[in-house]
Amino acid sequence: MKATPLLLCLACSALAAPPTKKQPEPAEPLPALEKNTIAIDGHPESVAADAEGNIYFTCIGSRLTPTEKDKDGYLGVIPHGSTEPKKITDVDTLDAPKGYQDGFLYCTDVDMVFKINAKTGAIEGYVDLSPSRMKFLNDLAFINGRLMVSSTDTNQIFYVDTNTSSYGELVTKQPIYKPNGLAWDPERKVIYLCEYATDEKGKPSGRLLSINPVSREVTELSKERGQYDGLVYRDNALYYSDWSKDKKPEAVRRLDLKTGRSAPVATGPVEGAADFILYDSMMVVPGMTEKKIHIMPIGGKK
């Protein structure tokens, strides 16, 4: 989250002209990322980048067991300009961590949410959701300033507060199934959600949805179906990863929210495209099943 500066203005006299409003400083350009594929020790699930171009990632460990408490998950960083990943936390610290936001790593870990210092790896807050009996807390996103988490196995989404260790459910008016990626649209004031779901025959049935956090109404955004994972909102469009299009450029797609049209944007195959990010003109995509992180240009027409 961005800190808001507090400006103190002193009036010199009753006739003094009103102070000129200070304009915000232009954002510094992000350091460029080069196209690359980086091998990871374990299965990477989510990524994020800071203003210095360092890429943080969460790894569920050597085995693809995101719902088990096996103590082999860890957090790592790929320093800008390097292709050598480094571990931030010890390998026995976490079970299946996922998610990152802002200057801290906010990790969903089976039935817990942790707030972890991105530089030191120290745990600075947590929320225990085990009383709700879930085993697959998944994506994290700041929704209008509040941290929200999806619970894929119990078909729920929660607001969580790592400072007070409290949480509460956002109960939608229409059902959601296997919720995964979350994103916030500050213009429309809605939550975007994608589902990692299949029907009774094993056919992909996940939807792209919007949720009004006030009315709690759920709206379907597209007739497409998939096994959706990562979700990013940018410039009136949704970018989303789809496990049903594994190993194809369609593994990451873009939905134009004005026209309803979608198109592939990955510029190379990814095996197990998980919780990705957009970084200027590039995307950083974890290849969860192939134990790699891909840095590639964003393709497709806008």
Where do the protein language model's features map onto the residues?
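Hydrophobic alpha-helical segments and helix pairs
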Residues: M112-T162
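Beta-strand-rich domains and repeat architectures in extracellular enzymes and scaffolds
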Residues: T37-K71, D95
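Short loop/turn segments that connect beta-strands within beta-propeller blades
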Residues: I78-T83, N117-A122, D161-S165, N212-R216, ...
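Short, solvent-exposed loop/turn segments at conserved positions within beta-propeller repeat blades
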Residues: T65-D72, S150-D153, D199-S205, S244-P249, ...
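A short beta-strand motif characteristic of beta-propeller blades
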Residues: A32-I38, T83-T89, A122-S130, S166-K173, ...
